[in-house]
């Protein structure tokens, strides 16, 4: 398994009427990073099966390209709870929903140490 971590950009917003501010974080580059990693793994033959955990339809062009370039590779999509999307049907070999109860049974160990040595710790609320 190769986790693909997202990037989050901080954005400060101001209300045009009252001037009060709020800080928001926007997810950036995640879909592109997942698509690029999918193509890398499939084209180089580093996997026989690729499992994408997402419901983002922005990944469909990369899935189509991967299937066209390497039709021998199996592509699967697992939808996070509440994120199923019919647009993936016919694009991948298998797609299924992850039930909320499955999250507790199939969590990664805590902490997870990435190949570069970075450690990811599970939030206490999980």
Give, region by region, the residue ranges found by the protein language model.
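A charged nuclease-like catalytic/ligand-binding cleft shared by nucleic-acid processing domains
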Residues: 1-49, 87-126
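Active-site histidine-anchored catalytic micro-motif
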Residues: 29, 41-90
């Amino acid at each position: 398994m190769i986790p693909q971590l997202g990037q989050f950009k901080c954005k400060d917003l101001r209300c045009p009427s009252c001037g009060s501010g709020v800080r928001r974080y926007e997810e950036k580059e995640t879909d592109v990073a997942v698509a690029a990693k999918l193509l890398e793994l499939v084209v180089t033959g580093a996997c026989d099966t690729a499992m994408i955990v997402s419901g983002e339809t922005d990944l469909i062009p990369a899935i189509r390209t991967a299937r066209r370039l390497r039709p021998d590779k199996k592509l699967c999509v697992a939808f996070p709870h509440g994120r199923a999307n019919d647009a993936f049907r016919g694009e991948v070999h298998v797609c299924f929903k992850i039930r909320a109860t499955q999250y507790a049974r199939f969590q990664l160990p805590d902490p997870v140490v990435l190949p570069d040595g970075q450690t990811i710790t599970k939030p206490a609320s999980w």
